[in-house]
């Protein structure tokens, strides 16, 4: 199996932007959100179960999942969030692990917004935290998702605190500043981490080979 770098951060931290920079360097990415989206695509068995449970109103006119509506429901009704997690998490975890095990590259970027909250750290060889201030999180997420600030604040409150998240970090990228003004610094940091991860992956591979030779 490839060396696994877990990438995480709070809502609005810019995880996708950073992951895209690694992808440009040829690093394969396993994205938990993308796995989740594909598992509940139009016509999927899991989406059918969600619609049966919550009612047809949880679907758009085109038959796709209305994510904004679902988000509002589960944040106002914890028991419904628990039901949804019990349905989705086993399928998501199974597919994520399948994709991770299939990678042949030296290392893979494992992008999981709730890596710490869902206690998935043990799947990773190293953890990269994308760090921003709570104020930046709120401003970015509200603008990006066109959601009410109150809902974004609820999501932030449901995630681990910035301080606790940072205690799990092996590496940190501060992404507080606007990428348009700060892109060169971020790209350089990503390149440095990329080289480090290649070295760490090689060390792990060599250790594994040496054990097998004994």
Curated annotation (Swiss-Prot):
<keyword id="KW-0173">Coenzyme A biosynthesis</keyword>
<dbReference type="Pfam" id="PF01121">
    <property type="entry name" value="CoaE"/>
</dbReference>
<feature type="domain" description="DPCK">
    <location>
        <begin position="4"/>
        <end position="204"/>
    </location>
</feature>
<keyword id="KW-0547">Nucleotide-binding</keyword>
<comment type="similarity">
    <text>Belongs to the CoaE family.</text>
</comment>
<keyword id="KW-0067">ATP-binding</keyword>
<keyword id="KW-0418">Kinase</keyword>
<dbReference type="GO" id="GO:0015937">
    <property type="term" value="P:coenzyme A biosynthetic process"/>
</dbReference>
<keyword id="KW-0963">Cytoplasm</keyword>
<keyword id="KW-0808">Transferase</keyword>
<dbReference type="GO" id="GO:0005524">
    <property type="term" value="F:ATP binding"/>
</dbReference>
<dbReference type="GO" id="GO:0005737">
    <property type="term" value="C:cytoplasm"/>
</dbReference>
<comment type="pathway">
    <text>Cofactor biosynthesis; coenzyme A biosynthesis; CoA from (R)-pantothenate: step 5/5.</text>
</comment>
<dbReference type="GO" id="GO:0004140">
    <property type="term" value="F:dephospho-CoA kinase activity"/>
</dbReference>
<dbReference type="InterPro" id="IPR001977">
    <property type="entry name" value="Depp_CoAkinase"/>
</dbReference>
<protein>
    <recommendedName>
        <fullName>Dephospho-CoA kinase</fullName>
        <ecNumber>2.7.1.24</ecNumber>
    </recommendedName>
</protein>
<dbReference type="InterPro" id="IPR027417">
    <property type="entry name" value="P-loop_NTPase"/>
</dbReference>
<feature type="binding site">
    <location>
        <begin position="12"/>
        <end position="17"/>
    </location>
    <ligand>
        <name>ATP</name>
    </ligand>
</feature>
<comment type="function">
    <text>Catalyzes the phosphorylation of the 3'-hydroxyl group of dephosphocoenzyme A to form coenzyme A.</text>
</comment>
């Amino acid at each position: 199996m490839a060396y696994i770098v877990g990438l995480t951060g709070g809502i609005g931290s810019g995880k996708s932007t950073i992951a895209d920079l690694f992808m440009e360097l040829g690093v394969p990415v396993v994205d938990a959100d993308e796995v989740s989206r594909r598992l509940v695509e139009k016509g999927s068995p899991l989406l059918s179960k969600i619609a049966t449970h919550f009612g047809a109103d949880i679907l758009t006119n085109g038959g796709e999942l209305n994510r904004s509506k679902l988000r509002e429901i589960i944040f106002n009704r914890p028991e419904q969030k628990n039901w949804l997690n019990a349905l989705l998490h086993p399928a998501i975890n199974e597919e994520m692990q399948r994709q991770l095990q299939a990678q042949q590259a030296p290392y893979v970027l494992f992008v999981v917004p709730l890596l710490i909250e869902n206690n998935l750290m043990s799947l990773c060889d190293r953890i990269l935290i994308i760090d921003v201030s709570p104020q930046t999180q709120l401003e970015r997420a509200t603008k990006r998702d066109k959601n009410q600030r109150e809902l974004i604040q609820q999501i932030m409150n449901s995630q681990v605190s910035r301080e606790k998240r940072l205690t799990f970090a092996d590496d940190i990228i501060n992404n507080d500043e606007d990428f348009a003004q700060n892109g060169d610094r971020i790209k350089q940091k990503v390149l440095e981490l990329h080289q480090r991860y290649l070295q760490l992956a090689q060390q792990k591979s060599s250790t594994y080979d040496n054990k097998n030779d004994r």
